[in-house]
Amino acid sequence: MTSTPIIPADLLPADGRFGCGPSKVRPEQLQSLVEVGSSVFGTSHRQKPVKDVVASVRSGLADLFSLPEGYEVVLGNGGTTAFWDAAAFGLIREKSLHLTNGEFSSKFASVAKNNPFIGDPIVVSADPGSAPEPVSDPSVDLIGWAHNETSTGVAIPVSRPAGSENALIAIDATSGAGGLPVNVADADVYYFAPQKCFAADGGLWIALMSPKALERVAEIKDSGRWTPDFLSLPIAVDNSSKDQTYNTPALATLLLLANQIDWLNGKGGLDWATSRTADSSSRLYQWAEASEYATPFVTDPAHRSQVVGTIDFDDKIDAAQVAKILRANGVVDTEPYRKLGRNQLRVGMFPAIDPEDVSQLTKSIDWVVSQLG
């Protein structure tokens, strides 16, 4: 093959963005930056115009997740990566337990292990592509896992393990929040970032925190434990209650996030969003199961993610070459997670992505593979 094949136009998706974060941003979100941006860009984040945007985000998320009484929407700068450190400083009293099954679920466990103020965590691991069973241990005061392991496309439902009454349940929902079913009351901390289901830029973390979690934040503060101000959950809680962040936020991120939340709520809320991602994912997995050369990487259908699909290819087909040809035709970011090292494609199926585009993607893949023979 001397030149890049040109995929027929009738096989291409209308929008070729299938990244797992940063993810597709709707055109209407970008237009909203133009329409409302002049009233907030270049203005103080301590004044009403910007605080109104933060208030919209907080109230919109409370509606989207049907936030139980006493729960608070807390936010801060730095993304999920910063929140892991903030949680190690401000949520773990003595010792934590972590379920790990991939790159991102392992990161919080690593942060907890390296924090000098708490004990070494208990780590319950499963191989990439599979899911550990949520468990408890009487020695721990926080149990954490990823609602959706972005690197592998494995989803683990949110629940309270037996015997966990004295532990906070902290769920990393970075790529799952807004696209997977959840009852937030089953967690004490449900935290995420805007660049996945919420179709915004990164650099912000959001945590839905229960009264029990808020009490833990205050308890650890009162203990005198040293914490960098940037990672201080008491400071984040206080600022969030005033509809602001500790330090200057990226306003474009907040505006994109606010618009996406309004869009999701306007369409029917979390039920609508999860039915849309279920539609998209069923199209991808059914195609793979019927394919002669592709198969879902996650073998247990109960743990196949609705928002991140990983598809293994027969060794005779070079998935990297397929992704390269797709990219040359405007269908982008289908490459697998770099450290997983598998012959596969990874497909984002967040709410902004049209299920019809997922179907078109499978047609494009079939056509590309037919040209490689």
From Swiss-Prot:
Q: How is the cofactor bound?
A: Binds 1 pyridoxal phosphate per subunit.
Family classification:
Belongs to the class-V pyridoxal-phosphate-dependent aminotransferase family. SerC subfamily.
Q: Which residues carry this modification: N6-(pyridoxal phosphate)lysine?
A: 196
> Primary place of residence?
cytoplasm
Cite the binding residues for L-glutamate.
Answer: 46
Subunit annotation: Homodimer.
Q: Show the taxonomic lineage.
A: Bacteria, Bacillati, Actinomycetota, Actinomycetes, Mycobacteriales
Q: What SUPFAM superfamilies does the annotation carry?
A: PLP-dependent transferases
| Enzyme class per UniProt | transferase
Q: Which GO terms describe its biological process?
A: glycine biosynthetic process, by transamination of glyoxylate; L-serine biosynthetic process; pyridoxine biosynthetic process
| Cofactors named for this entry | pyridoxal 5'-phosphate
Involved pathway(s): Amino-acid biosynthesis; L-serine biosynthesis; L-serine from 3-phospho-D-glycerate: step 2/3; Cofactor biosynthesis; pyridoxine 5'-phosphate biosynthesis; pyridoxine 5'-phosphate from D-erythrose 4-phosphate: step 3/5
Species of origin reads: Rhodococcus jostii (strain RHA1)
The protein, known as: Phosphoserine aminotransferase
